[in-house]
């Protein structure tokens, strides 16, 4: 194989390897624990944080969303979040878990990101918000920086579908259909 062919092949395969996440269908997400900040808790109008780990992703069907702490990342899969809100999924059997990587935020914006999460927690108290100040999930799951990943988990916490990056309208529909199937 000539050097030119090897170089061309490398250029073609490199983007696929760079965006390869660590989620395997039928398996649990690779284990992580977030001790700096962690899960945002709302109790009697008071916010606090508690340690969170991925072993807690059992018991409900869920969409696990990992997003960089920047508006551009949040917007990548806003269509899916709107579809989930519109579907009015049963809170006793479904939960959205959002992990926000504030380590991947525009410098100085972390306070604003946390304020936005607090507002969302008040609006959607049944949803779970995790603040990852050190980028633990990003590294362990090999996700793209400045992006948004979506993982659908069954009630046993096993991956049913995953993508790192913006979802197409067809993929949003595929996720919604899968959620309805898993909730039956």
UniProtKB/Swiss-Prot annotation:
Keyword Iron-sulfur: no
Signal sequence, start to end: 1-20
Cellular component terms (Gene Ontology): periplasmic space
Coiled coil (UniProt feature): none
Compartments where located: Periplasm
Domain of life: Bacteria
Pfam families (alphabetical): YtfJ_HI0045
Transmembrane segment boundaries: none
Keyword field: Periplasm, Signal
NCBIfam families cross-referenced by the UniProt entry: ytfJ_HI0045 (TIGR01626)
Similarity remark: To H.influenzae HI_0045.
Name of the protein this chain belongs to: Uncharacterized protein YtfJ
Source organism of this protein record: Escherichia coli (strain K12)
Encoding gene per record: ytfJ
């Amino acid at each position: 194989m000539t050097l030119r062919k090897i170089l061309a092949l490398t250029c073609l395969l490199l983007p696929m390897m760079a965006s390869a996440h660590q989620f395997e269908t039928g398996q649990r997400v690779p284990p992580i624990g977030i001790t700096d900040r962690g899960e945002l808790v709302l109790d009697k109008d008071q916010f606090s944080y508690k340690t969170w780990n991925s072993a807690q992703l059992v018991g409900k069907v869920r969409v696990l969303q990992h997003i960089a702490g920047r508006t551009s990342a949040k917007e990548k899969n806003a269509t899916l979040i709107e579809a989930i809100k519109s579907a009015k999924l049963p809170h006793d059997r479904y939960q959205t878990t959002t992990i926000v990587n504030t380590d991947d935020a525009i410098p100085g914006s972390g306070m604003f990101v946390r304020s936005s999460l607090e507002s969302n927690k008040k609006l959607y108290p049944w949803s779970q918000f995790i603040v990852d100040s050190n980028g633990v999930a990003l590294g362990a799951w090999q996700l793209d920086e400045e992006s948004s990943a979506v993982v659908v988990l069954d009630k046993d916490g096993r991956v049913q579908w995953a993508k790192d990056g913006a979802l197409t309208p067809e993929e949003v529909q595929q996720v919604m259909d899968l959620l309805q199937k898993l909730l039956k």
